[in-house]
């Protein structure tokens, strides 16, 4: 069966923003207007289609990226829009990361009252990383304090972007009535509650001057990106709408300009125009850079790496990237994937080149949040889910077994917080390990391990809310009862100076002995650089077959730490000398010698403990400003800056995570519940000496 929508009329987009900017409400309206829903689901009533997990409906926030397919008609042509609604809470940043990796365009939703918020900045940087073209939708124009112009200015100041408003609001707050279309130079008034009845009129006289200036700015910004239009503009020619749209589309796809629209999703104003902008301005899979891959076993980072192109063409070999795993209560494990090239039919086989495993494609599903529709095949540019793959996980490449390639995977941040968790009964124990393993399959930023000394299960994640949701799901979905400990900080160990270590492991016990001897130089590799191993052996003083064992011995010893039991990071190890014994040397002996070298190296290399530092933003009424700043300082925080936002103040700064547990309750009581805050991991830095000694002492005892 051929594809129902031509590829040039397919759009893969994400709805992305800060928590509470109105992403899910916007998506709900899109589903309503595209005919996917007959009744609008309201987030504040707990009825949103895209928020289908119980935890999401209770908290009114989006936790997992839900995918759905909708259709939109524009100029008598039918477009297919695959939408991913992503979470805005910083603890679920992995969901945003994996969604952006497979999208072609984004709709960034801003709250017209708050403007650009911290998670908006994080999301914007993530979109920059993947070069995702985007349009902005300034939402909540009906709210008290809504300010379109200020939000546009914040996009310039905070995000360093070049926003171009292509619409202006008519009125604001409870007098928000419609929008001015600057392209068409006309006003659109909304005449009913669901936004379906619209009336086109002349631009109101009181806004004529402002609209003229805004249109002039828009024309100039678009003309600057297109030589042909620039010539016409300078010659004073009237620029035609089709030419302007063509140039704006090219500038948007090339990430030179960001079109800005406005509306109120809750009041059903401006959403249809935003859908028009999605099909008019965001790219189809044919317009994004051609996907590049390497053959299995080739390091894509190497200078001489040879890349293979995978065009968005259904006749090319099949290539896809798995970006999400989900346990579905009805069909079992689901793997969401994006098809970059070729087509895939049910009943065929794919090769998972990341794991080198063949998988049979049993059933293919097109997802609508958590409703599913069986399909027989998927084509280049589609987003779909396959049921029940055994060995396939997030970030894996699946492709045609006859033409294997590996796509760039998805990189996720490391967890910064951990808690111990214990089952309440023996029956819960087995269920708990199954539940946690399943949840770890779904979420790459959630890790679990067993503490070797205490035997406790330790779960690690991106923040308190992240782990709270994981534990909640474990109890509800898998019916496990458990006790959860207090959150712990993910400290790290590192070194401050370079040191040469001579380490020898010799064991003679009659018969074949053990002999491994290495000389390793350890030095700091730089913040965030991780573990770097360099083989500096010349002349075979350590035979080549033992070098991987040395590298592994150091890496494994780094995991358990040295001075206080925290993982060692940011160390460069250079193996420069050593010796071996013809009979007694073995991989194990060299591994043990290397492990001893690392422990010695950390002790002698000026060891220090690093702690995670969080970037925080507190929005606080003027009256409570002093006590909030005093409190941040008392938590070893440092204030970076302050600015007024409406009648509140925004305080920005950095605070160690160790001092932020329970902050939400303290802030509420200090400000009578009138302040809000958000925080995200920013970097690691050395802990003060007195606190380091406390941690070392605690580890010893």
Swiss-Prot record:
One of its GO terms (cellular component) is cytoplasm. Signal peptide: none annotated. InterPro entries: EF-G-like_DII, EFG_II, EFG_III, EFG_III/V, EFG_IV, EFG_V, EFG_V-like, G_TR_CS. One of its GO terms (molecular function) is GTP binding. It is found in: Cytoplasm. Disulfide bonds: none annotated. Residues 8-286 form the tr-type G domain. Transmembrane segments: none annotated. It holds the Pfam family EF-G_D2. Keywords: Cytoplasm, Elongation factor, GTP-binding, Nucleotide-binding, Protein biosynthesis. One of its GO terms (biological process) is ribosome disassembly. GTP binds at residues 17-24, 85-89, 139-142. It comes from the Bacteria. Belongs to the TRAFAC class translation factor GTPase superfamily. Classic translation factor GTPase family. EF-G/EF-2 subfamily. Catalyzes the GTP-dependent ribosomal translocation step during translation elongation. During this step, the ribosome changes from the pre-translocational (PRE) to the post-translocational (POST) state as the newly formed A-site-bound peptidyl-tRNA and P-site-bound deacylated tRNA move to the P and E sites, respectively. Catalyzes the coordinated movement of the two tRNA molecules, the mRNA and conformational changes in the ribosome. This is Elongation factor G.
């Amino acid at each position: 069966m051929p594809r129902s929508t031509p590829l040039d009329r397919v759009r893969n987009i994400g709805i992305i923003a800060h928590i509470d900017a109105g992403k899910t409400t916007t998506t709900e309206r899109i589903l309503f207007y595209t005919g996917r829903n007959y009744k609008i689901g309201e987030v504040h009533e707990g009825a949103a289609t895209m928020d289908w997990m119980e935890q999401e409906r209770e908290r009114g926030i989006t936790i997992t990226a839900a995918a759905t397919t909708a259709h939109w008609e524009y100029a008598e042509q039918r477009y297919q829009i695959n939408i991913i609604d992503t979470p805005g809470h910083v603890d679920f940043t992995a969901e945003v990361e994996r969604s952006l990796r497979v999208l072609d365009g984004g709709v960034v939703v801003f709250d017209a009252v708050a403007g650009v918020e911290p998670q908006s900045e994080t999301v914007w940087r993530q979109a920059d990383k993947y070069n995702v073209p985007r349009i902005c939708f300034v939402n909540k124009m009906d709210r008290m304090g809504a300010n379109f112009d200020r939000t546009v200015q914040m996009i310039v100041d905070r995000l360093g972007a070049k926003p171009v408003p292509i619409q202006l609001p008519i009125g604001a707050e409870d007098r928000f009535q419609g929008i001015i279309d600057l392209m068409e130079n006309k006003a659109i008034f909304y005449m009913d509650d669901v936004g379906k009845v619209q009336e086109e009129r002349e631009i109101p006289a009181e806004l004529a001057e402002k609209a003229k200036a805004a249109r002039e700015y828009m024309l100039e910004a678009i003309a600057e990106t297109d030589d042909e239009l620039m010539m016409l503009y300078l010659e004073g020619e009237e620029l035609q709408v089709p030419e302007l749209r063509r140039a704006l589309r090219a500038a948007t796809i090339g990430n030179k300009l960001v079109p800005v629209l406005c509306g109120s999703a809750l009041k059903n104003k401006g959403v249809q125009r935003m859908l028009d902008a999605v099909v008019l301005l965001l790219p189809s899979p044919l317009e994004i850079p051609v996907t590049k891959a390497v053959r299995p076993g080739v390091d894509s980072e190497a200078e001489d790496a040879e890349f293979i192109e995978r065009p968005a063409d259904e006749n090319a070999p099949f290539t896809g990237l798995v970006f999400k795993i989900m346990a579905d209560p009805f069909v079992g494990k689901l793997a969401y994937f994006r098809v970059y090239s070729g087509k895939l039919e049910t009943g065929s086989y794919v090769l998972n080149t990341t794991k080198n495993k063949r998988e049979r494609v049993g059933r293919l599903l097109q997802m609508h949040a958590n409703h599913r529709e069986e399909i027989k095949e998927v084509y280049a540019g589609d987003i779909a889910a396959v049921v029940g793959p055994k060995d396939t996980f997030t970030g894996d490449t699946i492709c045609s077994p006859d033409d294997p390639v590996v796509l760039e995977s998805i990189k996720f941040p490391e967890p910064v917080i951990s808690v111990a968790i214990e089952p309440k009964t023996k029956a819960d124990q087995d269920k708990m390990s199954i539940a946690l393993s399943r949840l770890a399959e779904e979420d790459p930023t959630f890790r679990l391990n067993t503490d070797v000394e205490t035997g406790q299960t330790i779960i690690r994640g991106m923040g308190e809310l992240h782990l709270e949701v994981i534990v909640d799901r474990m109890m509800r979905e898998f019916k496990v009862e458990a006790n959860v400990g207090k959150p712990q900080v993910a400290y790290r160990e590192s070194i401050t100076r370079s040191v040469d270590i001579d380490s020898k492991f010799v064991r003679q016990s009659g018969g074949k002995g053990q002999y491994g001897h290495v000389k390793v130089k350890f030095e700091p590799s730089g913040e965030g650089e991780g573990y770097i191993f360099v083989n500096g052996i010349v002349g075979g003083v350590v035979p080549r077959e033992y070098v991987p064992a040395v590298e592994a011995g150091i890496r494994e010893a780094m995991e358990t730490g040295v001075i206080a039991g925290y993982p060692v990071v940011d160390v460069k190890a250079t193996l420069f000398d050593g010796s071996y014994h013809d009979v007694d040397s073995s991989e194990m002996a060299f591994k043990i010698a290397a492990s001893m070298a690392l422990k010695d190296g950390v002790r002698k290399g000026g060891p220090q403990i690093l702690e995670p530092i969080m970037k925080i933003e507190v929005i606080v009424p003027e009256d409570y400003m002093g006590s909030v700043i005093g409190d941040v300082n008392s938590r070893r925080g440092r204030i970076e800056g302050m600015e007024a936002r409406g009648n509140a103040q925004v305080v920005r700064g950095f605070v160690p995570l160790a001092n932020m547990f329970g902050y939400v309750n303290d802030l509420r009581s200090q400000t009578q519940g009138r302040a809000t805050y958000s925080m995200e991991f920013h970097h690691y830095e050395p802990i003060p000496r007195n606190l380091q000694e406390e941690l070392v002492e605690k580890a010893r005892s």
